[in-house]
Amino acid sequence: MTNAAEGFWHLSLETQMPIDTKIGTFEGQFIGGILNNSDYSPPDTLRQYGDKTNLYVPFRDAKRYLSGIHISYQPKWVEGLFFGFSYVNQQYLEDAQDEGDMLAALTDAFNRNEGIDDRMRPDRYASLSIRWIWKDAQAEVYFEGGKNKFQGFKEFLMVPEKDAGFVLGFTKLFDLPRPNNFLEVGMELTKLAQSTDYSLAELNSWYLDQNIRHGYTHKGQWIGAGIGPGSNLATIDLSWLNADHKLGFILERELHNSDFYYLAYAHNRDWNKYWVDYSIGIQGYTQIKDLMIQGRIMRITSLNYQWVHEREPGDPYIGPGNDLINWNFNLSVIYHLPTKRRQMKEKGA
């Protein structure tokens, strides 16, 4: 879950500090909330196929209930090593059979919901993560692998690549001559595109579901990775930073919805319509007491925007398509309330 969509009403229960045990420390969080439908329809809802079949089928007008759980474990024998498990379940409120469905993330993470009508089957996601912080080396690596339409660990072990996605990244700090100043180098790869065998055979993709056709959204916006279903993103970050400031460059390459691309164009064997964005920008922040100001400027070059690449007879196969340039500016201001707990935490640091 990310901040790609606007917020929604929810209840959150979480540990305020790690729970110590003989084998290490545990932390956890449970969330339950209501997801709403989009208030907007596609631009063209009357188009038909063969003058008989409507291409647009309205979504079900019903609210959805989302429940999720995250558990983190840090073994006491390895400093800086963390393991995590996350599970999310969403279903229509009208399909909830009893009060237990409101706690689905706690009760059915390992249950396949066998015997349930397919039209009432929930949309489920699960992931395992690992993060390792090397304090002396001022570096960390992290990985999270997830399954869309999670059907239990047996199915995961049999076909782990089916409906799978992952995030892999690392960050490293290098000391600069000036005390408490660092050069930060980071790289991250996000892969949500499915293997072509599965995406073509099942018309399936991350964040999409045949029963809950709204997908993993709130008001039509993805509440998962902002790149959306079927997409891949590679990011490189190079920045100068200290305790109060950060300024640096960012490079990105995004492949838009490869699952849709193969579904729409594979039968034509037209491999020259990939929609790819290349971005370069400057980002940073400054901290002034309890006030934080963040900003980013990005220049985005879109190749074959919206998968459009028209060629006239005689034109070379590889050539300019619907290529566009876009500038993106982002500015945010955050004020941290000087709570007593936060002041005590800062004194302890």
Each PLM stretch: what is its role?
Residues 1-84:
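Internal, well-ordered domain-core segments that constitute the primary functional module
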Residues 74-349:
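Exposed, low-structure sequence patches enriched in small/polar residues
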